[in-house]
Design a protein with these regions (language model features):
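Extracellular beta-strand-rich solenoid/capping regions of secreted or surface-exposed proteins
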Residues: 1-23, 31-46, 73
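Predominantly extracellular beta-rich ligand-binding scaffolds that present long acidic/polar faces
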Residues: 7, 21-24, 41, 57-61, ...
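Active-site and glycan-interaction determinants of carbohydrate-active enzymes
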Residues: 253-297
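C-terminal edge beta-strand
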Residues: 298, 303, 405-434
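Proline-enriched interdomain boundary motifs that mark the N-terminal boundary
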Residues: 307-315
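Surface-exposed or secretory-pathway low-complexity segments enriched in glycine-proline
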Residues: 332-381
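A short beta-strand micro-motif common to beta-rich folds, especially ectodomain repeats
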Residues: 391-406
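A cross-kingdom C-terminal cell-surface attachment/processing module
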Residues: 444-461
Length: 462
């Protein structure tokens, strides 16, 4: 469902005073002249009369307001999970904020609100917005988000120290990723950011300094520069048949081990090594719904890199005699990128046939047919298949490739993923359609109906 508006009014798309649950919704082009561009959430009591907003798999885009361009909430009673915030604008002149809480929880309820994990922002992607993202108050948890390339970062005002920002990527958000109100005691745990902006964080799980590392392998959106290009994240990308896009983490060719990554395996499922109920533990699944391991260190940010064989779909093409098949395997690499051909010899030695390695250290494994063509693969995952003549039938095989993720496997056999492939070749279709003439002369529609009537009689006659 998509909610949108273009006309000006005091409040935006939704005015809420109850419990509002949103799933698989786009809230776009909301506008309020003052507060609440997309949602105005009313209620200053913590009892059942106060409004509460829960949003999962929701896109907030192009919403504007002086304050609370996405949500204006009288209390911080909102929970955004697996959600996209992009291109929204808080237009106020002083401390304008996208997710704005007018007042804090009272002292008696604050700690309970934090431990309930019901309020805050998790497993979400936030980019290209204008204004502070949220004013972080006591009782809120910000966890496993990717927040980059916004006009401003967080405005932090949690004097009791019962607010948490953890396991997140917070980078290149205006002049400062974090601005602290007087007396703020927000706890920062295990975030990738500029520590000069957001502090060193918790002594046990401190923040990670991003330093001079290139953030994106390409532009803000679109194509990801192929390995060995630098860039901690791929640009924002919306896969086919998906609702939410994301910035995918990358394992760079300069990494010798997984521990060299600033993102992968840097979050903690068990923050202190023992207590899974810790407020700083990773979310159990990522923004896409993919499970984060409960036995190993997880990835910080909204996306967990997962080698999921079940997510690999068959590739291929149907062609006619004289044609060449062209298709891509870029979306079938199980979160990885093809290993550059220049790296293959050092890992595997020379090819047995003496030919040069292709991208991904490609191996073609025939399945149900002998080889009937020649296949080439470039670094970006584009495949060109040239058949050996005009044969009629199929060529079935597996493309066995090594990726920037699988190269870290201890076993050579586990360093490959298999992508099923099939080329079907047919002769040109020279059949010409023959049309029955039903007009002109005495044999027309009337006679045709009469014949159909006889057919009916024969069918039911006994």
């Amino acid at each position: 469902m998509e909610l949108t508006q273009n006309n000006l009014q005091a409040r935006g798309l939704i005015f809420n005073h109850e419990t509002l649950g949103l799933q698989y919704v786009k809230l776009i082009n909301g506008h309020a002249t003052v507060n609440g561009g997309a949602i105005y959430n009313e209620g200053v009591s913590t009892d059942k009369s106060a409004g509460y907003v829960s949003a999962q798999n929701v896109i907030f885009q192009n919403n504007t307001a002086s304050q609370g361009a996405v949500i204006y909430s009288e209390l911080p009673r909102f929970h955004l999970y697996q959600t996209i915030l992009r291109d929204n604008k808080a237009t106020g002149s002083d401390q304008s904020i996208l997710l704005y809480s007018a007042i804090a929880f009272n002292d008696d309820s604050t700690s309970g609100n934090a431990s309930s994990r019901l309020y805050g922002l998790k497993n979400s992607t936030i980019f290209n917005n204008t204004g502070y993202i949220t004013n972080v108050r006591d009782g809120m948890i910000i966890n496993n988000i990717t927040m980059i390339r916004n006009n401003a970062g967080f405005y932090l005002q949690a004097p009791k120290g019962d607010a948490y920002v953890s396991n997140s990527i917070i980078s290149e958000n205006g002049s400062k990723n974090c601005v602290f109100a007087d007396g703020d005691k927000t706890q920062f745990i295990n975030n990738l950011t500029k520590t000069s902006d957001c502090g060193s964080g918790n002594s046990t799980d401190p923040n990670i300094e991003i330093g001079s590392n290139t953030l994106l392998a390409g532009e803000l959106e679109g194509k990801c520069n192929a390995a060995p290009a630098e860039g901690l994240l791929c640009p924002y990308y919306l896969p086919e048949k998906q609702f939410l896009g994301f910035f995918k983490p990358r394992l760079l060719m300069s990494y010798q081990t997984l521990s060299d990554s600033l993102i992968v395996n840097r979050g903690r499922v068990l923050s202190d090594g023992t207590n899974i109920t810790s407020l700083s533990s990773c979310e159990s699944v990522d923004q896409r719904g993919k499970t984060r391991s409960t036995k190993e260190l997880c990835d910080i940010g909204a996306i967990e890199l997962v080698i999921d064989a079940d997510s690999i779909s068959p590739v291929g093409q149907d062609i006619l005699y004289g044609e060449t098949a062209k298709f891509s395997i870029a979306d079938q690499l199980a979160d990885g990128e093809l290993l550059p051909a220049s790296e293959c010899e050092s890992l595997l030695g020379k090819r047995e046939d003496g030919k040069a390695w292709q991208a991904g250290c490609l191996q073609i494994v025939q399945t149900n047919t002998p080889s009937k063509g020649t296949l080439t693969l470039d670094q970006e995952g584009n495949v060109t298949y040239v058949p050996n003549g005009n044969w009629h039938g199929s060529d079935e095989f597996k493309l066995r490739v090594m990726t920037t993720i699988t190269r870290f496997s201890d076993s050579i056999g586990n360093r490959y993923i298999d992508i099923p492939g099939k080329i079907v070749q047919d002769p040109p279709n020279d059949f010409e359609s023959k049309k029955v003439k039903t007009g002109g002369g005495s044999f027309g529609y009337g006679m045709l109906i009469a014949l159909l009537g006889l057919v009916g009689l024969r069918r039911f006659k006994k």
